[in-house]
């Protein structure tokens, strides 16, 4: 008999799904009392090297309002060649190609191990991938040079049939014609005036690519359609490499005390319009590189006077940021246009000051694009991260999907409340759509323009079965996720994941439901909800909501005597959940103090799209200790773990930090590691560096690497994350363990837990 932990892990590996509850309460009333909703973290393109895609199309239910895909949960009559849909119970005839099936000769989609299966659609033309580079030229020469080299490197990684385009901008916006031999030609637009797609079409003389009539069977490889601005790499590789090499800083003079005039808003608008006019509904990436904030035209985020700083959270709270609303509105309109036509927008922002990510965040957030933030294009952080965008799988294809749509089908006792993640609604109302919206709701279909193997959506459900309508003993609820997308090879693919979970009566089987709780998934699902609310609500209100939910969960599932906090017990399946909430409350996702609006937008962007493992690291960083007393070991994220004779390695997802304790730091300063008799000390210093390199080489985006020591200025990154169990207030308490006192007024986990128990057991609550 597998344990729940094994069951959860197997499901995640096979289907890319983690549910908050793995046994579902059988009535609406009981489900609302569970506090944490029935919800799932779903990774549509979860990598599964063991199951290659199958070269035929899925069999669909014949009922027009259902159209669910044949799956292992369907009942099959092999003699009559019929199958019953497990969602609407419609009886369907198998297509003629299934004539040879029997109990001993089953198609893959009926085998339980293929609860997730990927089909290749053989109809329709194979479209080329499109990459449109949008480059800011208002930056220092060495930054621009490094960026040009990175872009030239990326050209060498693109498939020869991929179409590429180039737009550069500063005070003006230039759309470069790439088909010209021996001459550079470009169309120049004013950076202060926005253009509609229609105006752009007329000015550039563009036409839409005709989509050829879909035909069955393999396609004869036709040359990819193109125009003067988007050309196949194989044709213009040398030309474009030379053109990038010749790119100069924006020639307009910048007076002293002024910022350069930068037209980011118009440049992105032209990029969106260009693709909209020529390649709607074809996989395309707009890759925008910016070295500072937009200072003119639509989408500007700050004026050109250097004495006026760019907005802070304080300015926004005091309604003293005059460009925020207008700028955000401009970029939201562009994001929605790009999402409608299925195009991805990436933003690579490298500058020492803010660049306007707060206003632009909707572009990557709604289109599934990447957001990368760094200090300079001339750092390994940017160069390595950008190179990883073009990572390839074992078949030599990019690990990116384009133009995805996710459709969810449910059995009749459960409905869909909504999704939180890098998606937009397709407004598809159906029988399985709930009235109660959470996140992007009111639909059972979403568009995800850009997908990677780790792109993860949070999907929230509502149990709608009435209290007085019992579900038959042994009944199961089913959910089907159907993801259609354009593979980087140009093929259309459909991935279908069908899962089922048992129902239980919460009045008689509450133990079964409690035992099925997945506290890690629940913590991330509640965190996404809290961060989603934080975008529109006041910070303290969100924290109060989070606390209230936690107290209610403790009251529902804790064991205690009324008004006796010391009697409170939480079972193992819930014991880590309060700790996750404690670290979430202190995290940069909900605490904006000490972060710029751009930094907050950047952190939230990544949390809203990463899978469970990475999201947990973001909430509760991992801490490893290295010492002479044994091999490296994970230790508590607590100030008591900071000891003089230890080296600590902390992984926060965004940073990898190595911290040397006081004694270790003194030995290192004295150079003991260079003496042959202290070789073991040299090995001790090297061990965390090797482990850090392993993480740095695999993560996207590449984390910031920090090497610090006791008393070092950057030790603050560690001190701000650990639980302050020792502070300046209690460091001299009798019997206090050794460790580093933290100078903070924040409450410790112990105080937080004591307070939580007191509130949970209170009869007044």
From Swiss-Prot:
Q: Does the keyword Transmembrane helix apply?
A: no
Coiled-coil ranges (or none): none
Gene3D superfamilies from the xrefs? Answer: beta-sandwich domain of Sec23/24, Sec23/Sec24 helical domain, Severin, von Willebrand factor, type A domain, Zn-finger domain of Sec23/24
Spell out the InterPro entries in the cross-references: ADF-H/Gelsolin-like_dom_sf (IPR029006), Gelsolin-like_dom (IPR007123), Gelsolin-like_dom_sf (IPR036180), Sec23 (IPR037364), Sec23/24_helical_dom (IPR006900), Sec23/24_helical_dom_sf (IPR036175), Sec23/24_trunk_dom (IPR006896), Sec23_24_beta_S (IPR012990)
Q: What is its main location?
A: membrane
N-acetylthreonine: residues bearing it? 2
Give the UniProt keywords, A-Z. Acetylation, Cytoplasm, Cytoplasmic vesicle, Endoplasmic reticulum, ER-Golgi transport, Membrane, Metal-binding, Phosphoprotein, Protein transport, Transport, Zinc
Pfam family of this protein, just one?
Sec23_helical
Subunit and interaction comment: COPII is composed of at least five proteins: the Sec23/24 complex, the Sec13/31 complex and Sar1. Interacts with SEC23IP. Interacts with HTR4. Interacts with SEC16A. Interacts with SLC6A4. Interacts (as part of the Sec23/24 complex) with SEC22B; recruits SEC22B into COPII-coated vesicles and allows the transport of this cargo from the endoplasmic reticulum to the Golgi. Interacts (via Gelsolin-like repeat) with MIA2 and MIA3; specifically involved in the transport of large cargos like the collagen COL7A1. Interacts with DDHD1. Interacts with TMEM39A.
| Biological role | Component of the coat protein complex II (COPII) which promotes the formation of transport vesicles from the endoplasmic reticulum (ER). The coat has two main functions, the physical deformation of the endoplasmic reticulum membrane into vesicles and the selection of cargo molecules for their transport to the Golgi complex. Required for the translocation of insulin-induced glucose transporter SLC2A4/GLUT4 to the cell membrane.
**What is the protein named?**
Protein transport protein Sec23A
Q: Which organism is it from?
A: Pongo abelii (Sumatran orangutan)
- Gene label: SEC23A
